[in-house]
Amino acid sequence: MKIAITGKGGVGKTFIASTLMRLFEKNGFKVIGVDCDPNPTLALAFGVEEEIVPLSKRHDIIEERTGAKPGTYGNIFKINPKVDDLIDKVGYKIGNITLLVMGTIEEGGEGCVCPASVLLRRLLRHLILKRDEVVILDMEAGIEHFGRKTIDTVDLMLIVIEPTKKSLITAKRMKKLANDLGIKNLGVIVNKVRNEDKELLKDIIKEELGLEVLGFVPYDEEVIKSEFLGKPINLDSKAAKEIEKIFNYIIKLKNTT
C-alpha cells in the first residue's frame, strides 16, 4: 500500500502521517515513512531529537550513485542510479518503521535535472513501484518539488484540511492534481475539528470538493502537548482513535485492490 498525504502547511499532515505509520506497525506491517517536506519534521513526531541528514545533503552518496557532484549542471551523470539499497543505507529505524528524509533541492528550481534531483526522484519511484512495505509519503503542500510523475501510481492520496478557507483552496488544487495524474482513490481528512461543526463541514466539503470525508480528527490538547514536548501521541488519545478509523478504512481498501 502506497499512500501520499498532502495538504496546506500547518494542517497536521505530519501528525496524521506518523500516527498512521505507528498503527500499521502495531498491526504487523513493515513501514517506510518518507519525509518529502523541505522543512522535515517527521522524525520529531516519533520523538527523535537527533538530526537526520536529508538525502539531498548526502553529497557523498549523490556523487557515488550518479557519478557527479551535487549542484553541477551540464556534466554527464547517470540518469538511472542504483537506489534499491538506499533505504537500508540512509534510513532511520524505529522498530519496524524506517524513516527516510528526502530534503530539498535548492539549485535549479522546479524540474531541475541535476544529480540530486535525479537520485531523489528515482528513489521515490522505486519506493512506490518496487517495495513491498507500506510506504507513507508525508508530502509538502505542492509536490512540484519532486515532479508530478513521482506519485502518479500511489494507491491512495489523503488530503488533510482544517476548518479554514485557505486549506480548502489547497485541497481543491490537490484534487485537480490527483485527477490529472489519474489517482483513483482520494479522500479527505479534516483535522482540528469541534464535534458541533462536523455536519456543517461535511456539507461544505461535499459541495466544494465532491469528496468523501474519511475522518474528522478532533481538536485534542494531548496532540498539542505531545508535539510541544517532541513525543509521539498516545494511541489511546481521542485524535489517534479517530485516525484508527481511517486506518481501518485503508485496510479495507488494501484488501480490495
Swiss-Prot record:
The keyword rRNA processing does not apply. It comes from the Archaea. One of its GO terms (cellular component) is cytoplasmic side of plasma membrane. ATP binds at G7, K8, G9, G10, V11, G12, K13, T14. Keywords: ATP-binding, Nucleotide-binding. Gene3D superfamilies: P-loop containing nucleotide triphosphate hydrolases (3.40.50.300). To M.jannaschii MJ0084 and MJ0685. This is Uncharacterized ATP-binding protein MJ0823. It comes from Methanocaldococcus jannaschii (strain ATCC 43067 / DSM 2661 / JAL-1 / JCM 10045 / NBRC 100440). The lineage of its organism: Archaea, Methanobacteriati, Methanobacteriota, Methanomada group, Methanococci.
